[in-house]
């Protein structure tokens, strides 16, 4: 069996080396353009449709490519990009993709780590949602309608301003993430122990289905609404907008970031062991992420946290539950919740206005690979020492350990399509970033990631080895033939026992498999 590193390279090279002659013929591009025009959307679609002949085509395509591995001139290009500005543009795109036999890729923020929202091995169209970014807040009801093309930064900024900094929303720490994909995969962040995931605070949605109908929660039915929350909406429909429930945040939160390589009088593995004991059981208002990274053969443990309250109460909790860290008053920074968003971006307090989170242009572009795991039992001290050793030998890889517990353990695994609830201590994100183009650098970094991932196998969930959909990972399986059997390989890892229900919903609402991609939910074909 080929290693997942080899599989990743084969898949990537296949995408990169498709010759120009294998691109869609001009006739197909013309046919699509004519088709969406004939459909006569309410708002003229011509100015929002880009084919390869359009001088702005590559700019539009690359604006939301967030992984430099796919930012080049040799990846297969879509037949067209529709930068939808009205729901009728989406209806026209769906109908014309069906008519012409084109696959559809739906992109809201472009953060699909393995590029599945803008890549394909067959003729395809990209439905780009970045123009659909409206945010309508109802401060009396503490709700908001958020279009899928809005970014988390735009949501946070508007919610804070509209609520006088007394409301927030539980979602990710990266302001550039698009709401469409982030929410539909679950949407986790540093308030999940208090309020759960984004999907646990979504109360309605407006979609366009496979028949180009505009539906809401009532008209789509509870099964499909269930699937959209954690099951990856791109397998079922196009989400126009989400109705979210805003959550209370205090006037001040307290943040800290303690980095140690043994310089606090405690061995880092001892601190990691203690973190395991308390991180998923501590006060629900407190989230402490442990990040492990290595340089010069030395592993650094970083404890980055946020408490929904003042520093005095935080120190009281830490002194009682985690005194080994030695957190002190000078390391605690009180700020508004909206300001904490910048802190998690490593922007020093007071050095930038909160409006910086409205910037859609990334601070930097990188080549990257991400993977995920779930830990359900404490890792022994010898196990931690082994992990630190493998990290010290693969210095391009870091791990972020994100604690669960709290509200996450209270919500049943079947409440939404997202199954990773009670029984999980923490989730791991494996990160490998590099800045040098070329196959040699990519192969080295992917190999390092795979070595660390394999070394972790004794300590993580099994049968299946669970994975987080928002950390998209082509290594765990791909469905190039649109079969149930291929889909189940990765499906049970992302969705566990919820996979079969997702297949049932998919088969009912999209029997022709219009919404498909390399890791979509498959249709169950009766025999």
Curated annotation (Swiss-Prot):
What protein am I looking at?
A: Berberine bridge enzyme-like 14
Signal peptide span per the entry?
1-23
Q: Which GO terms describe its molecular function?
A: FAD binding; oxidoreductase activity
Instruction: Report the co-factor binding details.
Output: Binds 1 FAD per subunit in a bicovalent manner.
Q: What does this protein need as cofactor?
A: FAD
Q: Where is this cross-link: 6-(S-cysteinyl)-8alpha-(pros-histidyl)-FAD (His-Cys)?
A: 111-174
Q: Which family does it belong to?
A: Belongs to the oxygen-dependent FAD-linked oxidoreductase family.
Domain FAD-binding PCMH-type, chain residue ranges per copy: 74-249
Q: Which UniProt key words apply to this protein?
A: Cell wall, Disulfide bond, FAD, Flavoprotein, Glycoprotein, Nucleotide-binding, Oxidoreductase, Secreted, Signal
């Amino acid at each position: 069996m080929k290693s997942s590193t080899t599989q990743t390279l084969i898949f990537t090279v296949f995408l990169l080396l498709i010759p120009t002659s294998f691109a869609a013929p001009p006739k197909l591009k013309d046919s699509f353009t004519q088709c969406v025009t004939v459909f006569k959307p309410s708002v003229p679609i011509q100015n929002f449709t880009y084919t390869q002949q359009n001088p702005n085509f590559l700019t539009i395509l690359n604006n939301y490519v967030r992984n430099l591995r796919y930012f080049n001139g040799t990846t297969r290009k879509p037949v067209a990009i529709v930068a939808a500005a009205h729901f009728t543009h989406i209806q026209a795109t769906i109908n014309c993709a069906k008519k012409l036999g084109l696959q559809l890729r739906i992109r809201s923020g472009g953060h699909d780590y393995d590029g599945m929202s803008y890549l394909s091995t067959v003729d395809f169209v990209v439905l780009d949602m970045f123009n659909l970014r409206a945010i309508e807040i109802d401060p009396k009801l503490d709700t908001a309608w958020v279009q899928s093309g809005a970014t988390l930064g735009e949501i946070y900024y508007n919610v804070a301003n509209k609520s006088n900094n007394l409301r927030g929303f539980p979602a990710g720490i990266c302001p550039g993430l698009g709401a469409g994909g982030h929410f539909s995969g679950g949407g986790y962040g540093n308030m999940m122990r208090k309020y759960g995931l984004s999907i646990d605070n979504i109360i309605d949605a407006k979609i366009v289905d496979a028949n180009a109908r505009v539906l809401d929660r009532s008209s789509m039915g509870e099964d499909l609404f269930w699937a959209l929350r954690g099951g990856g909406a791109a397998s079922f429909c196009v989400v126009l907008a989400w109705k979210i429930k805003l959550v209370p945040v205090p006037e001040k939160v307290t943040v800290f970031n303690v980095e140690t390589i043994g310089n606090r009088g405690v061995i880092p593995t001892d601190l990691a062991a203690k973190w395991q004991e308390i991180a998923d059981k501590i006060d629900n208002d407190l989230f402490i992420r442990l990040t492990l990274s290595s340089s010069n053969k030395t592993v650094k443990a970083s404890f980055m946290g946020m408490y929904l309250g003042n520093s005095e109460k935080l120190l009281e909790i830490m002194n009682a539950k985690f005194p080994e860290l030695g957190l002190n008053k000078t390391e605690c920074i009180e700020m508004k919740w909206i300001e904490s968003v910048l802190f998690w971006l490593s922007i020093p307090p007071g050095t930038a206005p909160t409006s910086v989170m409205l910037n859609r242009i990334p601070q930097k572009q990188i080549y990257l690979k991400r993977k995920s795991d779930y830990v359900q039992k404490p890792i022994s001290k010898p196990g931690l020492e082994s992990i630190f050793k493998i990290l010290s030998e693969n210095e391009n890889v870091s791990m972020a350990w994100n604690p669960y517990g709290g509200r996450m353990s209270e919500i049943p695994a079947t409440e939404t399509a997202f199954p990773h609830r009670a029984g999980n201590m923490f989730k791991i994100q494996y990160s490998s970033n590099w800045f040098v183009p070329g196959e040699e650098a990519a192969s080295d970094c992917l190999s390092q990631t795979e070595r660390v991932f394999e070394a972790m196998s004794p300590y993580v969930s099994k049968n299946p080895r669970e994975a987080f959909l928002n950390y998209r990972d082509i290594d765990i399986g791909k469905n190039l033939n649109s079969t149930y059997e291929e889909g189940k390989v990765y499906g049970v890892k992302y969705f566990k026992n919820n996979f079969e229900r997702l297949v049932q919903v998919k088969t009912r609402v999209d029997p022709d498999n219009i919404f498909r991609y390399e890791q979509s939910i498959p249709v169950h074909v009766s025999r």
